[in-house]
Amino acid sequence: FNGLEGELPEDVARESIYKTLALKGDKTGPVIGIVPITEHLSEKKLAKISGNKKVQMIPQKDLQKTTGYVHGANNPVGIRQKHNFPIYIDHSAQDAGFLIVSAGEIGRSIRINSQELADFVNAEFADIKE
């Protein structure tokens, strides 16, 4: 299903679907932010929490060579296994108890306990939405 528009399964709320965004910090290099698809990532907040002055989205043409995934398929588990990039999950996922993220292929997603995902990928919960 398309998370942004159209019908969703009855037990799926649009705000429980999260996008995994890859950015580049001016001091740390790549940094990953995970926010609801219905929201926008605050680059300013992510920069501050990750120890950067600024962060910017990694251009799509560089995404696969940086994360190992194409646009729309970034998976936090795979990114953590291949790279040691810092990962930040918006705190709304912690409050909700679970989230749905890409499973590493376009059109495939997994529903997972928020805390278990954070523990597994060594992520930090933070306020990173605009």
Task: Give residue ranges: language-model regions.
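Extended, low-hydrophobicity, polar/charged segments
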Residues: F1-E130
